């Protein structure tokens, strides 16, 4: 009986895809064009740079203060998922605790300033809000969330024993060391950095295509502003134009775009998912943090700006 159900389900999916080939092709083209024109030129150089930095840091001792500085610089300036890469790296080296890593992930795995200015502000929000106000609306709520999360994390760590956390981190470190390439040969190291960066940027493109197709299918079969907003939150690149084109008040439209900017879209969440899970951090906590940041950005803009 199960085999029959699998056959019926497979046939239904294939038939559905054939009947909606135009929508799927349009979504695939849309996702690939955005990936090629906006993501690869901006993100790939920073992914390579992050790989070189982590390769260098692997051979030296890094203090906690230095680790925090590097996390904020890379996480806020290089674009996601580079923030996930560097946070997971310091967690595997046991420089930063699990609770602190979870608290920093939502804010320090963010869109790059270039994408924020060129795509979000210049192409869509310039007529509605100044860039200074945009920075305030996007980052201030995330800073507030991070401060609260870190405070709660510190309170929790004082009440509980750290032995379990250290054991978990040590296990992850051993696993990471066993899986890491031999850094003795610089050519092998740089080749691995390039291969890893190309792999990650390709995975990002695939996720962008998948969620662009899902958004197009959702808009095709469902109607209403609620459905349009939900489809926009699937992928930030295609979602911002969707929100921009909605026939709603300028205030709400701007707040939604800022909220999506802080959230990053489901596509961005899944781009970081594998890196988070390999490091034994919680993807659910990360998703919850991103959702809270998005909600805070929306409320902050609606109430104070």
Set out the residue ranges of the language-model regions.
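Transmembrane helical segments that form the transport core of multi-pass membrane transport proteins
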Residues: 190, 194-261
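N-terminal signal-anchor module of multipass membrane proteins
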Residues: 2-60, 197
């Amino acid at each position: 009986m199960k085999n029959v159900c699998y056959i019926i389900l497979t046939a239904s999916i294939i038939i559905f895809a054939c009947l909606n080939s135009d929508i799927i092709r349009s979504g695939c083209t849309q996702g690939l064009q955005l990936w090629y024109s906006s993501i690869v030129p901006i993100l790939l150089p920073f992914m390579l740079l992050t790989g070189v930095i982590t390769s260098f840091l692997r051979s030296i001792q890094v203090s906690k203060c230095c680790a925090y500085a590097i996390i904020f610089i890379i996480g806020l300036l290089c674009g996601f998922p580079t923030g996930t890469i560097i946070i997971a790296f310091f967690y595997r080296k046991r420089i930063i605790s699990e609770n602190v890593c979870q608290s920093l992930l939502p804010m320090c795995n963010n869109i790059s300033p270039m994408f924020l200015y060129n795509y979000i502000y210049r192409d869509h929000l310039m007529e509605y809000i100044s860039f200074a106000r945009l920075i305030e609306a996007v980052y201030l709520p995330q800073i507030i969330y991070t401060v609260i999360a870190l405070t709660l994390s510190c309170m929790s760590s004082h009440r509980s024993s750290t032995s379990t956390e250290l054991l978990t981190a040590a296990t992850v470190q051993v696993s990471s060391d066993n899986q890491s390439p031999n850094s003795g040969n610089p050519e092998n190291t740089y080749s691995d950095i390039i291969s890893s960066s190309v792999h990650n940027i390709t995975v990002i493109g695939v996720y962008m295509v998948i969620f662009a197709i899902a958004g197009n299918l959702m808009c095709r079969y469902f109607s209403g502003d609620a459905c349009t907003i939900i489809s926009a939150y699937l992928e930030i690149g295609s979602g911002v134009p969707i929100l921009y084109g909605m026939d709603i008040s300028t205030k709400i439209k701007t707040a939604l775009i800022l909220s999506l900017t802080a959230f990053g879209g489901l596509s961005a969440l899944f781009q970081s998912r594998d890196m988070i899970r390999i490091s034994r951090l919680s993807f659910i906590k990360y998703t919850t943090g991103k959702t809270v940041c998005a909600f805070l950005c929306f409320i902050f803009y609606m109430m104070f700006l």
